[in-house]
Amino acid sequence: MLHVGINGFGTIGKRVADAVRVQPDMTVAGVAKRSPNFEATIADDRGYDLYAADGREPFDEADLGTAGTVHDLIETSDVVVDTTPSGVGAANASLYAEHDTPAIFQGGEDADVADVSFNARANYEKAVGADTARVVSCNTTGLSRLLAPLRESYGVEKSRVTLVRRGADPGQTGRGPINDTLPDPVEIPSHHGPDVQTIFPDLDIDTMGMKVPTTQMHTHSVNVTLESEPATEEVTALLADESRLFLIPETLGIDGAGKLKEYTRDAGRPRGDVWENCIWAESITVEGRDLYLFQAIHQEADVVPENIDAVRALSERTASAEKSIRRTDEALGVGRGLVEHDGSPQRVDSHADD
């Protein structure tokens, strides 16, 4: 049983902890927090051992017991998943090295924070036995999952993606915009293209980014020039076969991210989370060698199964990407609980204790 420490219990950390808890080969060693805020209270209520990142006194004053400091958590963990805010993970890197504990960082860190940038579908094997890995950002994760099967089946000559990004997560009260549409950045490419190239170094990709006043999901407008000319139906079947790609049937009447999140909440997903890329099936179009589609990415959730797979890769628990992905998906419920593209319902009870 792998003992996994979670340093940080915010948007990503709490989801990773719950995902680790339901894995058959993992257990949560504990979670580290800087302050005894509501997230620390939730962690305690869920039965996770709390560790103090910046001293135990504030937790004692808040009557929240701690099992030790972050150093103690790292020492007791086989692998640590660092889900602290951007920049903090890089500052923590020396802690993990000091304790000789493999560590997984998030996509907000620069690529050089880790030995490898990681996406389970695209380059799992490169992280097997590594000391550190960086799970790429939510947008890069979504693009990598989409591009990997396209590259394998048809070859990719060039990718062009416009990313319409949510202004903030629901809990980020200090971010925006509130009433504007921003090119972000104005320069081309946005950082997303170079980040995808940390997964596919030889990929020709251009990306443009925008921010809009919503907290729902990111939406991508994708154009991929392939090296061959498959039929639209062939590409649709290829993508439908990927467990972490959900093709939204036209019959559901889901025309935006708001309805998509409403659907996943009603379907019983914990927190309404969408671990999969959500591709509008009717948007998939092939003209010559050019593929077009729209997809939505849930920025709070899509990297969660990737973190679980990264734990297995670093710990060398399995060298097989397919085996790890299947185990993660089965335990978490990825690829299930929603209506499949052929219209047949596939529902399972949620394993998460949310």
UniProtKB/Swiss-Prot annotation:
Catalyzed reaction equations: D-glyceraldehyde 3-phosphate + phosphate + NADP(+) = (2R)-3-phospho-glyceroyl phosphate + NADPH + H(+); D-glyceraldehyde 3-phosphate + phosphate + NAD(+) = (2R)-3-phospho-glyceroyl phosphate + NADH + H(+)
GO BP: glycolytic process
Pathway: Carbohydrate degradation; glycolysis; pyruvate from D-glyceraldehyde 3-phosphate: step 1/5
GO cellular component, one term: cytoplasm
UniProt subcellular location: Cytoplasm
InterPro entries documented for this protein: GlycerAld/Erythrose_P_DH, GlycerAld_3-P_DH_AS, GlycerAld_3-P_DH_cat, GlycerAld_3-P_DH_NAD(P)-bd, Glyceraldehyde-3-P_DH_2_arc, NAD(P)-bd_dom_sf
NCBIfam families registered for this protein in UniProt: GAPDH-II_archae, PRK04207.1
Annotated protein name in UniProt: Glyceraldehyde-3-phosphate dehydrogenase
